[in-house]
């Protein structure tokens, strides 16, 4: 396998191929590829060797198993709901017929007792229905949390592939392959990776932002190098920010 980047994040010392296969850096030798550092953490643990796609798929499969296991906790609650619904239907069918020779006072007393009984049972059944639904909702919330974990796993995998694609893009260009010394990656406010580049020329840092629209950003940076820094000097700015569309923002 041919690596495209070396990962030197906290606890990591591994190589990655363009397809997202990770393997540990050999102790006896080093492969000369771009280096990524920073506070970013790849989707798989530092000790992992193998395909990130396989790792992500396995974690999602485990999560699906937990969701199915949690779903089984609902079964007795569903049965209790059906029983409660049947009780409510039976309650509606409860009536009293006046006996042929029954005195009116006695019949009215029985009607009153039935009304009180039905009112009491109706409250009990409604309470039972509410409690059962609350318990089901709590279980569903745990399932939703698992699905949210799956979304984060997929997003983390997609973000990692974007970083690898960025490295491949840099390596295909003779100028950028020579100019970019280090790629620093951190997590942005939304959890997505944010890139900073350490160039060989000058004393500035390039704030690149997300790996999205990488070709456009690199083209914009190259234009600024040729038309800007070449005239005013490579040591003029401390940071050059190309993360914003159609803008280059510099700080001294």
Indicate where each model-derived feature is located.
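Charged, solvent-exposed interaction patches on well-folded alpha/beta domains
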Residues: 1-252
